[in-house]
Amino acid sequence: MASIFTKIINGEIPSYKIAEDDKFYAFLDIAPLAEGHTLVVPKQEIDYIFDIDDELLAQMHIFAKKVAKAIQTAIPCEKVGMAVIGLDVRHAHIHLVPLQEVGDLNFAKEKLKLSDD
């Protein structure tokens, strides 16, 4: 069965796309820690990020870097933090979160409530 991220990539579930190329897709998180919280996923469905072959993993980080630079341009923040957790969705992904302080990358804190606008 396809992961929720594969369904998003295939357009079966709507998303707010930030960037895309032939191997990766970046979109806004539906339960963000901060405005601009973005997920970067490989189009190839791989459960565990450390099972991704070295070349694709390096390319994923380069893609994530480009997305992070764009986020930092669009969202006023000190830096863009990066996290990999991998327990909630069985499809490897990187979280990119605009940060003002270290505590902004706390996944246990309450998520933002955003409108559809």
Mark where each language-model region is.
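HIT superfamily nucleotide-processing domains
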Residues: 1-117
